[in-house]
Amino acid sequence: MRAKLSNLQSIPQVVAEMTLDEKLDMVGCYRACHTRPIPDMDVPAIYLMDGATGLNGTHVVLDYLTDPCRADDPRTAYATPEMVALNRVDLNEAAAKYKGDALMTDLVEQAAKYRPGGRQHISFPSGINIGASFDPITAETIGHAVGQELRDAGVDVCFGPNVDIARDPLGGRNYEMYGEDPELVAQTAAAFVRGMQSAGIAACAKHFLANNQETNRNTTSSNLSKRVMMELYARGFEAAIEDGHVLCIMSAYNAVNGEFTSYSKKLLTDLLRGELHFDGAIVSDWGAAGQNKEGTLAAGMDLIQPGPNDMTACKQAVQEGRLSEEVLNDRVTHILQLIVEIKQNQRHIPAPVSYTHLRAHETPEH
């Protein structure tokens, strides 16, 4: 009988008794939005999903399609057009339209678990609107409401808030950000995180670091001095860590001073862990790890998203000594710490009834 995950003190023994494949599956994500469960060690899966303005329906369907238990090659699900079409229609209409289509019927049934009565989920105020209130209490209240909605849907980690700085007026995701002033962003982000995590789920502040434009976001480099980095671009993350006690942080696609954030030990380990004293889980933006997964793990990444990932090269790197198993153990430890903290919080915070179930968004007050 192997060790059981029961609290933070149990983690070292659990890690020591996990197999190499289990560790790699843990850091490589089990399916699009789930980590790998290990039932005989009482390690549950956790559900990670967008977003800070409400439940992401595409993620719900994609996660279902990438379940290894129902797909020969889960990675083919990312090319499934049905999941996009499904989120654009009323589920009652979809059930009638796709009657007789086994795949679509399955998807409709799965989506219905998250969309009561076939209705769309609530769309909460975007970041730029929350920032414009200049009111941390409002930010905390909205954060708590979003957290309740996501927790009711079974989500454990929300990919948000976006604590980047709105620097480019043409930035395609400025609406997610709280504004261009670093102190406004810092105070708003910390409040939103506190509110969300008070509902019993983990917030995931993103995108670390200096991710401020959509144009060429996978190849561009944000070149900046250390002072500008700390006083402007890192300020929101610093506040989310110190004042919000955020449990998770997501890396970015872009490079900083010529080094891509997902492969940067300077950013993920030296800055985020060292100078900003973050002790939670670091996750990659979707696809940011690319093919060099051992490189991103060595730099400080804990969870490579989205899953399922082929970890064969990482396994070979460990076996050949190019990636230390101690490094891998450290990454797994951070994920298990996140799982324990979430589940402990959920035991002490009553499960909510969602706003969608209550139809609260149809009231004059909302």
Q: Can you annotate each of these PLM segments?
A:
Residues 1-359:
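Glycoside hydrolase catalytic-domain context in secreted enzymes
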Residues 360-366:
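A short, hydrophobic C-terminal helix/tail in secreted or cell-surface proteins
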